């Protein structure tokens, strides 16, 4: 049996789901269509001001404590959430109530979170009189640095210095850079999706 009627992705090209309706009208079992290979919508507050920034990252969709799927590659921040090939590969698992875990430490050039933490303490000691806002200079762009510090609940002012960073602050920033959790609100619709998930239940043919 060959079924090649298309899904619902890119409806402007003619993919309107009519093949699935034909199958279900004939009594053939099918699973619901859903957008896949598309952008993920997240809470906008944690990523405010980051639109247009690209980073190397490892991303994973988390349901409670279970990792449903993970990828690594280039991530693109947007006003609505995140995009990039690695993100789009995770989209079929992204549902409201789940979390998108973003790890940036390897993309910054570190082997693991421990090495990132040690670099923070090295900079605290050697950059003691430099502004705290410059702590991540050379590791990420200033807008991303500020967002990570906000997410780690740092209170950075113009007078804050790198030497004032405490061990607890370093730990919170390390956890954020290694496992930044963004609440998922959904995915972009079929207009943005490259493919469709769901369709004819092949196990029943």
Where are each of the predicted segments found?
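A short secondary-structure junction signal
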Residues: 13-15, 88
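General beta-strand structural signal in soluble alpha/beta enzymes
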Residues: 3, 30-33, 186-189
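Glycine-rich nucleotide phosphate-binding loop and flanking beta-alpha elements
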Residues: 8-10, 84, 94, 204
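Gly/Ser/Thr-rich active-site loops/lids in small-molecule metabolic enzymes
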Residues: 19-30
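A glycine-rich dinucleotide-binding beta-alpha-beta segment and adjacent secondary-structure elements
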Residues: 147-205
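Short hydrophobic core segments
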Residues: 1-12, 22-24, 74-80
């Amino acid at each position: 049996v060959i079924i090649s009627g298309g899904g619902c992705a890119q409806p402007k090209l003619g993919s309107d789901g009519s093949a699935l309706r034909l199958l279900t009208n004939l009594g053939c079992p099918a699973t619901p269509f859903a957008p896949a290979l598309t952008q993920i919508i997240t809470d906008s507050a944690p990523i405010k001001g980051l639109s247009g920034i690209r980073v190397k990252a490892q991303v994973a969709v988390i349901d409670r404590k279970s990792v449903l799927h993970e990828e690594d590659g280039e991530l693109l921040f947007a006003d609505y959430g995140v995009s990039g090939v690695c993100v789009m590969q995770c989209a079929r698992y992204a549902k409201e109530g789940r979390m998108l875990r973003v790890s940036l430490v390897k993309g910054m050039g570190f082997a693991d979170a421990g090495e990132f933490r040690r670099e923070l303490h090295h900079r605290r000691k050697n950059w003691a009189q430099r502004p705290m806002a410059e702590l991540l200079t050379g590791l990420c762009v200033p807008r991303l640095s500020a967002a990570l510090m906000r997410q780690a609940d740092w209170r950075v002012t113009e007078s804050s210095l790198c030497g004032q960073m405490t061990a607890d602050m370093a730990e919170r920033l390390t956890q954020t850079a290694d496992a930044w959790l963004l609440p998922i609100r959904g995915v972009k619709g079929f207009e943005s999706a490259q493919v469709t998930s769901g369709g004819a239940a092949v196990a029943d043919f």
